[in-house]
A protein has these predicted regions:
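C-terminal beta-strand-loop-alpha-helix "lid" module of Rossmann-like NAD(P)-dependent dehydrogenases
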Residues: 1-314
């Protein structure tokens, strides 16, 4: 009995130590989550400004042509896949890879993995990888996004790939994060006046990027900004050159926003997972403590009984 009680006591201490770790990770994830959502929101003005400029150029030039708006010359796909650097985030990483498996089925795929888990996953599954230079999503900054965008644009313009898409995790709420994909190249939402919403932050705030069709600017003001005002703009050396030079910057802004949204999603998933782990640890400690106290009480009762029996026998 004594040995059993000692084992239970050690088990309680072990669970308490684990609970301290999970609670600390929960608090850290919650703190970082606020910063990640703010970074995604702060990237919105830059992205929207470039989007409006590209849309204006495409709209004001009927004979406009760009290698980035034409359909690819082949059926090869490049996927930029954003995953996490660590585990302990519920199904965050597994959901991304499962989604990508369904999305890329039957396609000639090359990936550009972002995040340690993404690099490890595709290396293990022997999927062609464009580069492993961006293995730590937490260390990626704006300059890295510009480098990735230039690399992708050069590969697409050179005919290496016919389609480029970005797989990231959308932040819907603290409880829900869903993997999704958005097409990067060829560009299509600039020739379509209505466009479409590319991504949303959900509870984190407003859309990190919107097309002009989803803009909250009144229709009359849109006409002024995208119509008469833009007709006075002179692009040097020409609008097509300006458009092509802006595209990499536009994609870099989109990529940076998506990375921050994915990081926010990972942190939310980790916070919820650690909260659940902490709750489970508390329940386990309560159960073990109850068992320990009962065993201790039984041991004391047995000792008293033995003493009384000995006294009566004497």
């Amino acid at each position: 009995m004594a040995a059993n009680m000692k084992a239970v006591k050690l088990r309680i201490k072990s669970v308490q130590s684990t609970m301290q770790i999970t609670r600390a990770m929960q608090l850290v994830a919650g703190s970082k989550l606020i910063k990640a959502k703010q970074k995604a929101e702060n990237s919105k003005p830059y992205f929207e400004t470039l989007h409006a400029t590209l849309t204006g150029i495409a709209r004001d030039n009927n004979d406009f042509q760009s290698p980035y708006t034409r359909s690819g010359e082949n059926d090869k796909w490049l996927y930029i896949v954003i995953a996490g650097d660590r585990g302990l985030a519920g199904g965050y990483n597994a959901n991304v890879f499962k989604f990508m498996e369904e999305e890329s089925e039957g396609r000639d795929v090359t990936v550009l993995p972002i995040g340690k888990k993404s690099v490890e996953h595709y290396a293990q599954h022997k999927v062609p990888i464009l580069t492993k230079a961006f293995a730590e999503v937490a260390a990626i900054g704006v300059s890295d996004c510009f480098e990735i965008a230039r690399m992708v644009c050069e590969a697409y313009a050179g005919g290496e790939f016919g389609h480029v898409s970005l797989c990231y995790t959308k932040f819907v709420s603290m409880m829900t994060q869903t993997p999704g994909v958005t097409s990067l190249l060829p560009l299509s939402d600039f020739t379509n006046p209505k466009g479409n919403r590319l991504m949303e932050l959900g509870d984190a705030g407003t859309a990190a990027s919107k097309s002009s069709g989803d803009s909250e600017i009144p229709e009359e003001e849109q006409k002024t900004e995208t119509g008469g005002a833009r007709e006075l703009i002179l692009y040097e050396p020409d609008s097509e050159t300006v458009f092509n030079s802006i595209v990499p910057d536009y994609l870099a802004g989109l990529l940076y926003a998506c990375i921050n949204i994915s990081v926010a999603s990972e942190l939310a998933a980790r916070r919820m997972a650690m909260e659940a782990a902490t709750d489970n640890a508390e329940e386990m400690i309560e159960t073990l403590s109850l068992y320990y106290n009962r065993a201790r009480q039984a041991s004391i009762t047995q000792e008293i009984t033995e003493i009384v029996a000995g006294a009566e026998g004497g």
